[in-house]
Amino acid sequence: MKKTDFILIGVVLVLIIVGIVSSKGTEALEEIEFPLTLSGEVGLHEITYSEYEEKVKNGDAFVVVIERTTCGYCQQYMPLMEEVANEQKIAVTYINTDNITEEEFEKLSTTNKYLKKNQWGTPTTLFMLGDRIVDSIGGYVDKESIEAFFKDRVVVGE
């Protein structure tokens, strides 16, 4: 075999491994009946870590953005998320990591399947059904991408 054949085989194997590893952060979508009604008040609202734990424990369908005030990308992203939440009349929550204790941050980082298995930063958006991760957005995306994230997955208000 030629050197290029070995390189090609190596690249294909790496892509397969990356695909397998990256798919472990979310639950199989075919198991979930869409659209889901998100719990909570319409718009973008900060929740405490205790409120987050309660939503997980109750098996609620909810979207939580993990952000921090001092994050430049969060400062750009959060107004877009708020705009989409208000326009589509859906409930979106967020946890500001600057407002939780170190112990709560540690619990959040180690008990949430996505955060435990993946490197993450802020903003991170998680669509959750109890403790199951339905989908996620890692980092800043534009408004159209946020709208696409919700499309056909959530009940839009009227």
What is each of the regions a protein language model found here?
Residues 1-42:
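N-terminal targeting signals for export/organelle localization
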Residues 43-46, 90-108:
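Thiol-based oxidoreductase modules, predominantly thioredoxin-like and allied folds used
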Residues 44, 69, 73-76, 117, ...:
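Extracytoplasmic/periplasmic, Sec-exported soluble proteins
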Residues 51-91:
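Local sequence-structure signature of Cys/Sec-based thiol-disulfide redox active-site neighborhoods
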Residues 63-65, 92-95, 124-127:
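Structural recognition of the beta-strand scaffold that forms the well-ordered cores
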Residues 69-73, 98-102, 132-134, 142:
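Solvent-exposed loop/turn segments at secondary-structure junctions
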Residues 101-121:
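Short Fe-S-cluster ligation motifs
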Residues 119-158:
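Non-catalytic, surface beta->alpha helical segment in thiol-disulfide oxidoreductase systems
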